Amino acid sequence: MKNTKTAFITFFPAVPDNMGSSTVVNSRFKSWPSKKKLFQLSHIKKINNKNTKTIFIRKEKPLNKILSLPKLICSVFLYLKNSKKKIIIIEGASWIFYSFIVFFSLKLFFLKSKIIYISHSIESEIRKKFSNIFIYLLTKYLERLMFKFVDIATSVSKYEKSKIKKLYNVNTILYPNAINIDYKVGT
């Protein structure tokens, strides 16, 4: 995977590792074979180094995240612009609106890039239970577009894989959540 760069994108703090989704993302990131960088929105800690770029937001509110998307997109663009092969991994453990805006924008900049959408759940089903009808319908529409137009879409279980096929007529790759355990148990 020489000359390949991968941008991992999260809309929540993945570093430092502070919740289940961040543990899964960190495990995936650490085991990814090519040159890579994690781009995250975070209200916890601003971490900027060789492997991580944080767009810091004061409070974890949807409007703050929406207003931070242009800066996130610009950061990813600057990282990938000189790379021959570009892979963009969008971690879908946040509202699909953020994922869709980033997907659409980066696809305009990098037509030949490969974009992978890592679905952590069927979000429209969650929004149907816990959000108003407008947010539910918008989520379902954007989720349909994401599954249809990304280069690779994943699902975390056989149940969700079949449900996505039924809802959106899209075949996903089964990619269960996993973590890497890097410590040894003492005897």
What are these regions (language model features)?
Residues 119-131:
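A short, histidine- and acid-enriched strand-loop-helix "catalytic/donor-clamping" loop
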